[in-house]
């Protein structure tokens, strides 16, 4: 694992803090349901709890990995952090100040200071714009650089992300997938952010290109003292870049720990299952071990511990009572009733 430990300074205010953050989406009644209502049915809108009460602190200079299967709420969490999709409840604090209490100018500064890199670089880049404008338009609009220095500014950024500066007049379709993702990275860097949310930023790339882009993220972190929230369904990818790892399942954090701890001493059965899916030389495992069962619908999450239908260690308590995150060791917390059983046996 080629990451650099970034240990929070004791007592230091986190760069970003989430407190009981929730994000709900309302799914309206479809046409068939509305027609049925005319005949006396009582179909009602459904509520999806995409993020169901997340607490998290991110300190300046560290990389937090967020891992989970598709549909677990990790991308929604990233959009909440980037203020693309505001939280339905809870608090988001930036340098100790609540977003709700910020003035309009402070909120704009936050929007510039927290940038997002998306999974599909082709879909996130305007196909009608040249790279010079894709990267350089926003910093000119926000007064970061003058229009006269735009071309020079963009050329420097392109070189920093490993692109030929002479390609500024090209369009996105004239680049490979890895090059397009580098354009997206340069666009984020152009606004001089403090925190970058990387949402499956290498998932659409070939494995060989993934390694190059991951190493680029690490180099840029060292050069610009960046902070990352790195979202991925692949625990192996997150392990390559992260200082701490957050495991999410159906909108909730089930485990959070230093990266080394997650790989050497995972506590939650879901974390253990994610690790079992990873083929690797370290474990001498040659067969793929998928997680049993299907991810439940967030429209109808299971009662109690939402992982219990797929958990090989589920007890009767797991079906009725939702576990809470509890600290097992400094920096390591897990939400599993098995920890109570282990404690009672000691």
Across the structure, where does each feature detected by a protein language model lie?
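P-loop NTP-binding/switch modules centered on Walker-like glycine-rich loops
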Residues: 197, 201-205, 209-286
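ABC ATPase NBD coupling module
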Residues: 42-43, 99-115, 133, 141, ...
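Conserved ABC transporter NBD signature motif
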Residues: 90-98
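Short catalytic/signature loops enriched in Gly
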Residues: 3-4, 8-14, 27-42, 258-346
């Amino acid at each position: 694992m080629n990451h650099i430990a970034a240990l929070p300074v004791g007592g230091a205010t986190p760069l970003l803090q989430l407190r009981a953050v929730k994000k709900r989406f309302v799914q309206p009644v479809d046409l068939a349901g509305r027609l049925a209502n005319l005949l006396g049915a009582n179909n009602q809108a459904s509520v999806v709890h995409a993020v169901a009460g997340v607490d998290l602190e991110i300190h300046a200079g560290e990389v937090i990995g967020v891992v989970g299967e598709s549909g677990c709420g990790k991308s929604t969490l990233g959009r909440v952090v980037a203020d693309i999709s505001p939280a339905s409840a809870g608090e988001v604090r930036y340098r100790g100040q609540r977003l709700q209490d910020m003035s309009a100018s402070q909120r704009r500064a936050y929007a510039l200071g927290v940038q997002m890199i998306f999974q599909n670089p082709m879909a996130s880049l305007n196909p009608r714009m040249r790279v010079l404008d894709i990267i350089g338009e926003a910093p000119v609009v926000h007064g970061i650089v003058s229009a006269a220095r735009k071309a020079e500014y963009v050329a420097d950024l392109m070189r920093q992300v490993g692109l030929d500066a002479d390609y500024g007049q090209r369009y996105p379709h004239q680049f490979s997938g890895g090059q397009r993702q580098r354009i997206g990275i340069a666009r984020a860097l152009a606004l001089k952010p403090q925190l970058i949310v990387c949402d499956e930023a290498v998932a659409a790339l070939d494995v060989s290109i993934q390694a190059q882009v991951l190493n680029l993220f690490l180099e840029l972190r060292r050069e610009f003292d960046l902070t990352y929230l790195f979202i991925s369904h692949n625990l192996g990818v997150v392990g390559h870049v992260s200082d701490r790892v957050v495991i999410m399942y159906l909108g909730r954090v089930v485990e959070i720990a230093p990266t080394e701890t997650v790989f050497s001493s995972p506590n939650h059965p879901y974390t253990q299952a994610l690790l079992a899916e990873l083929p690797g030389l370290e474990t001498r495992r040659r067969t793929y071990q998928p997680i049993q069962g299907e991810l439940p619908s967030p429209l109808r999450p299971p009662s109690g511990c939402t992982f219990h239908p797929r958990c090989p260690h589920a007890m009767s308590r797991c079906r009725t009572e939702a576990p809470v995150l509890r600290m097992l060791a400094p920096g390591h917390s897990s939400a599993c009733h098995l920890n109570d059983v282990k404690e009672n046996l000691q």
